[in-house]
Regions:
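Short, mixed-charge low-complexity intrinsically disordered segments
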Residues: 49-128
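Short acidic, gly/pro-rich beta-turn/loop elements at beta-sheet edges
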Residues: 22, 42, 107-109
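Short aromatic-glycine-(Arg/Gly/Cys) micro-motifs in beta-strand/loop hairpins
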Residues: 1-28
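Generic "edge-of-domain/loop-turn" microfeature
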Residues: 19-21, 39, 104
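A short, exposed loop/beta-hairpin motif centered on an aromatic-Gly-Thr core
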Residues: 25-42
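Intrinsically disordered, low-complexity regions enriched in Ser/Pro/Gly/Gln/His and often acidic
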Residues: 4, 8, 35-36, 57-59, ...
C-alpha cells in the first residue's frame, strides 16, 4: 500500500562523541521519525528525563535547563521548520540530539508486506 503524497515531519537523532577527541568519530545511538513538532520535541524530552538521574550534576543541570527553558525555544522553532539541537556533556562524552524538518516521501507500507515466493527457497546455514 502506497501513501499518496509526501508528508512533512521531523527526523530526530541522538549521537555521542568523546569530548575533545580528534580521532574518534561520533557514534550514532538512535533515530526517530516524528510527524509533528510536538512528537519530535517529546522524543528529546523523554530521553533527557530518562537519563537525568544517571548524569553528573553539571549535565543534569544542563538537561533540566533545556527541559524548563530551552524546550520553549525548540517548541517555537520547530513549527517554523527550523532545525534544533540539544547537547549535554557527561563524563567526557557529548550527547547530542538533533531535530531536523524533513519531507517524508511516499513508500510502500512497512507492515503486511509479503516476501517473494523464492525467499522460501533459501535456507539458513549454521556456521557452528
Amino acid at each position: 500500500m502506497l501513501t499518496d503524497k509526501p508528508r512533512r515531519g521531523y527526523w530526530c537523532e541522538c549521537w555521542t562523541e568523546p569530548v575533545g577527541s580528534r580521532t574518534e568519530v561520533p557514534a550514532f545511538r538512535a533515530s526517530f521519525d516524528a510527524y509533528s513538532a510536538a512528537q519530535a520535541d517529546r522524543w528529546v524530552a523523554v530521553a533527557l528525563r530518562t537519563i537525568t538521574p544517571a548524569l553528573d550534576s553539571d549535565a543534569s543541570d544542563a538537561a533540566w535547563t533545556w527541559l524548563h527553558d530551552g524546550r520553549a525555544d525548540t517548541r517555537r522553532a520547530l513549527p517554523r521548520r527550523e532545525p534544533c539541537t540539544v547537547a549535554i556533556q557527561h563524563a567526557g562524552t557529548c550527547i547530542t540530539w538533533t531535530i531536523r524538518p524533513v519531507l517524508f516521501l511516499p513508500v510502500a507500507h512497512r507492515q503486511g508486506a509479503e516476501l517473494p515466493a523464492c525467499s522460501q527457497d533459501f535456507k539458513h546455514l549454521n556456521t557452528d
